[in-house]
């Protein structure tokens, strides 16, 4: 292992929860659209649903509308997963005394984001912990001009011990202090 370079991979949209939501939305959307179409054509049954009991106006139209919206959200989520939005890496290079933060984006204009910082521009590592209904456990790189650059992935919160260990390892590697513990 190279002791002069440290690279942390960041998981983007290719998370299990995104795959699950994509499947749920697509399945539900197709079901709702089939129900709306079945009520329009007065089909008797598809998948154990009796469409003759559902009036096309207003119930069938609403079902088709919600089904279409669900399918569109599912397609958007598929695109996000395919392009791995938010994925990237954090690279800390002691030889060049440089930090690279790379992330993938959505559109062509901001498809890739690469931030480079010199070691001399870095003030500290900051840990932010918030335990509410939606817990927040993040590690930030704090620059001397007070910018806070998030280093952890977005999504499921990490364990408290993992956050602390990552922050301590990184602070020791960069020889800078930690704030917020």
UniProtKB/Swiss-Prot annotation:
It is a multi-pass membrane protein. It is found in: Plastid, Chloroplast thylakoid membrane. Seems to be required for the assembly of the photosystem I complex. The lineage of its organism: Eukaryota, Cryptophyceae, Pyrenomonadales, Geminigeraceae, Guillardia. The gene is ycf4. This is Photosystem I assembly protein Ycf4. Its main location: plastid. It comes from Guillardia theta. Belongs to the Ycf4 family. One of its GO terms (biological process) is photosynthesis. GO terms for cellular component: chloroplast thylakoid membrane; photosystem I.
